[in-house]
Structures are given as C-alpha cells and as structure tokens.
Curated annotation (Swiss-Prot):
Record has Ribonucleoprotein as a keyword: yes
Role played: Forms part of the ribosomal stalk which helps the ribosome interact with GTP-bound translation factors. Is thus essential for accurate translation.
Family: Belongs to the bacterial ribosomal protein bL12 family.
Natural source organism: Bacillus subtilis (strain 168)
Oligomeric form and interacting partners: Homodimer. Part of the 50S ribosomal subunit; present in 4 copies per ribosome. Forms part of the ribosomal stalk which helps the ribosome interact with GTP-bound translation factors. Forms a pentameric L10(L12)2(L12)2 complex, where L10 forms an elongated spine to which 2 L12 dimers bind in a sequential fashion.
A GO BP entry: translation
GO CC annotation terms, alphabetical: cytosolic large ribosomal subunit
Protein name as it appears in the record: Large ribosomal subunit protein bL12
Family matches, as NCBIfam families: L12 (TIGR00855)
Name of the gene encoding the protein in the UniProt record: rplL
InterPro entries: Ribosomal_bL12, Ribosomal_bL12_C, Ribosomal_bL12_C/ClpS-like, Ribosomal_bL12_oligo, Ribosomal_bL12_oligo_N_sf
Keywords assigned by UniProt, alphabetized: Ribonucleoprotein, Ribosomal protein
Disulfide bonds: none
Lineage, uppermost ranks: Bacteria, Bacillati, Bacillota, Bacilli, Bacillales
Pfam families: Ribosomal_L12 (PF00542), Ribosomal_L12_N (PF16320)
Amino acid sequence: MALNIEEIIASVKEATVLELNDLVKAIEEEFGVTAAAPVAVAGGAAAGGAAEEQSEFDLILAGAGSQKIKVIKVVREITGLGLKEAKELVDNTPKPLKEGIAKEEAEELKAKLEEVGASVEVK
C-alpha cells in the first residue's frame, strides 16, 4: 500500500494538532532527529561568525572594587577626564570607558584596570 505525496498531505491537513504532535514525535524517534535542531545550530553559527569579524571593542568599567582611588587615577589616565568626572564615572558603574578601540588596546587597558582591583568587560 504505497501512498503518494498528495495523499500524505491530505492526511496531514485532516489531522488534529494532537495527532500532528504525535506524528512529529514518531518521526523524531524513528529517524533520530529533532525538529528544533536546525534553528539552534544556525543561530549559534551566526553568532560565532559575528564574534570573529568584530574589530572594534568597547571597554566597560563594571565595578571599582576596594581600591577606588587607584581605579579613579587609572580612569583619569585612560580617558583624560578631570578628577570630578572620573570619580562620577567610577561611582556610577557600569559605564563605558572607551568605545570602538582595537582588541589589543582593550586588553591592555583591561589589564591595567584589573591590576588596581577594578572589574572590567570588553564587548
């Protein structure tokens, strides 16, 4: 008893949602596949490709830590801000310090800030 494609489509059109759900589960079990897998794989691959192509990064101060005065000094050195502005920036984290910088510069500045106890993110 061979079914052609039109008969299969007609049967699927007449089926209830519960019957279609059972059909999908049976197909997944029979062939060892899942219906959601292609979506997750495609999304993951696109995100990975975007991360590799990124050439500009943002340096974000997430927190000052316990040595706030040292962090303020380094922030002033990095940004060229005055004492008052640097203190306000450090007190109101998370805040971007530099935007659109090269990865090497971002990593150097991150290391400098972490050295004095700040928590920093590179995005």
